[in-house]
């Protein structure tokens, strides 16, 4: 008997808009050495291969920190830090080159796998590495010579784009050469950040030990503006102690995400390398799974347009069937669309409300208030109310009223008071359904 899964079909359909949206988009992925050493790394590679097959243009930047620490311990070589950056002398550089070369080969081999009965079957991915990044030395700081520790000087964006146009994956590490033919040890997060900026990437994705950025209660912060992310980073830096004075992977990635967004990269994502499928869930679901640092919110509050009617109908139809909202036909919505305000997220209408002015009485009705079930924990109802209050003020109206059967307490929390039918505009009084017995509430003094 064949196994049938409607969940698979549903998930496939829900991800379709994101498949279309991400096709031909450039994504820079930061893979720290911790992610490479984690047992989940094989699944991460499988997911990256899936993104490649879906038409995303992928650049991978890998790090070597834990592998380097292990090798330094084995060789009993000391490589001190200055201001969070490892000082790379000649011997340290040779060890970095050894580890970076080994990881490059290991990652390339993993991406080249095409065994049957595995997610990589038939993938045939071309992995390209090269001298796309030109480095320069950090020099001397406070009398400390960084030796072969360096920074990005130049990036061959044309060369990288040629490889990406051929659907190859570009793989780069923390070692880059200079115009003088020397090698330098770079911070992998800085390499990834500069690549995202100079390639005009659509996304920068960092794999961390945590599932994104957490607040003080340990809850995931789904979305941050750069200014908010900076405040969190400053708080985390203040919590560092002399015994634990180095930035964590999450802090390093967050720092890169802030820089990338400020420089024009639309979205930077921080997700866990321990969570199986985190990359797919972050990119192909409405809410994602980690934290994204965004130039602008992915949610937009705006006036509804005729093209939004389908989304509004999808939102309000379940509430109409439950009797919570009065049924509206498509034709009625087309006539009233100018009255509606919506909150949109990634093309999905997640909340709506309409404003019906009664200028003779100096009042307006707030009607057809609906919020998608997945988004009712936030303050979107308050956002819509404030937007409609502003509109009512523009119309020189002084009162806002609602008719509700289920949300009496919520409206009272917002300052509405319960009144009887006589307080309604005359036209509305004539249309009041006494069988429905909706509660009438008024907000005065807009």
From Swiss-Prot:
Origin: domain of life: Bacteria
Keywords, sorted A to Z: Acyltransferase, Amino-acid biosynthesis, Arginine biosynthesis, Cytoplasm, Transferase
EC numbers: 2.3.1.1
MF-aspect GO terms: L-glutamate N-acetyltransferase activity
Compartments in which it is found: Cytoplasm
Pathway connected to this protein: Amino-acid biosynthesis; L-arginine biosynthesis; N(2)-acetyl-L-ornithine from L-glutamate: step 1/4
Keyword Transferase: yes
Coiled coil: none
Gene3D superfamilies documented for this protein: 3.40.630.30, Acetylglutamate kinase-like
InterPro entries: AceGlu_kinase-like_sf, Acyl_CoA_acyltransferase, Asp/Glu/Uridylate_kinase, GNAT_dom, NAGS_kin, NH2A_AcTrfase
Principal cellular location given in the protein's record: cytoplasm
Domain N-acetyltransferase: 299-438
One GO cellular component term noted in the UniProt record for this chain: cytoplasm
Pfam families the UniProt entry points to: AA_kinase, Acetyltransf_1
BP GO terms, sorted: L-arginine biosynthetic process
Reaction equation(s) it catalyzes: L-glutamate + acetyl-CoA = N-acetyl-L-glutamate + CoA + H(+)
Family label: Belongs to the acetyltransferase family. ArgA subfamily.
Name of the featured protein: Amino-acid acetyltransferase
Species classification: Bacteria, Pseudomonadati, Pseudomonadota, Gammaproteobacteria, Vibrionales
């Amino acid at each position: 008997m064949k196994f049938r899964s409607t969940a698979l079909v549903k998930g496939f359909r829900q991800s379709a808009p994101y498949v279309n949206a991400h096709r031909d988009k450039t994504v820079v992925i930061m893979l720290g050495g911790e992610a490479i050493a984690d047992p989940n790394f094989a699944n991460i590679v499988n997911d990256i291969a899936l993104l490649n097959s879906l038409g995303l243009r992928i650049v991978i930047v890998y790090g070597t920190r834990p592998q380097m620490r292990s090798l330094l311990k084995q060789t009993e070589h000391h490589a001190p830090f200055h201001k969070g950056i490892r000082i790379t002398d000649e011997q340290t550089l040779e060890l970095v080159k050894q580890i970076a070369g080994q990881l490059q080969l290991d990652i390339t081999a993993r991406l080249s796998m095409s065994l049957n009965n595995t997610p990589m079957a038939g993938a045939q991915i071309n992995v390209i590495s090269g001298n796309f990044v030109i480095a320069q030395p950090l020099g001397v700081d406070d009398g400390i010579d960084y030796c072969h520790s360096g920074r990005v000087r130049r990036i061959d964006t044309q060369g990288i784009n040629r490889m990406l146009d051929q659907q190859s994956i570009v793989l780069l590490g923390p070692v880059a050469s200079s115009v003088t033919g020397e090698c330098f040890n770079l911070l992998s997060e800085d390499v990834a950040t500069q690549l995202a900026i100079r390639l005009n990437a659509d996304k920068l994705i960092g794999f961390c030990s945590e599932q994104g950025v957490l607040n003080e209660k340990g809850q995931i912060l789904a979305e941050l503006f750069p200014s908010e992310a900076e405040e969190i980073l400053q708080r985390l830096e203040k919590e560092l102690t002399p015994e634990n004075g180095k930035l964590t992977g999450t802090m390093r990635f967050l720092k890169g995400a802030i820089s990338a967004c400020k420089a024009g990269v639309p979205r930077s994502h921080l997700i866990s390398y321990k969570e199986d499928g985190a990359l797919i869930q972050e990119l192909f679901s409405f809410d994602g799974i980690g934290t994204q640092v965004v130039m602008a919110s992915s949610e937009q509050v705006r006036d509804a347009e005729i093209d939004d009617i389908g989304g509004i109908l999808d939102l309000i139809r379940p509430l109409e069937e439950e009797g919570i909202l009065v049924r509206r036909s498509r034709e009625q919505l087309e006539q009233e669309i100018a009255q509606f305000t919506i909150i949109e997220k990634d093309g999905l209408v997640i909340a709506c409300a309409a404003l019906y002015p009664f200028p003779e009485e100096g009042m307006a009705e707030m009607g057809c208030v609906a919020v998608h079930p997945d988004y009712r924990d936030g303050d979107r109802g308050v956002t819509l109310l404030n937007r409609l209050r502003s509109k009512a003020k523009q119309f020189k109206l002084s009162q806002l009223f609602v008719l509700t059967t289920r949300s009496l307490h919520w409206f009272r929390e917002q300052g509405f008071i319960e009144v009887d039918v006589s307080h309604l505009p005359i036209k509305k009084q004539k249309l009041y359904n006494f069988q429905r017995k909706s509660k009438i509430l008024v907000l005065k003094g807009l």
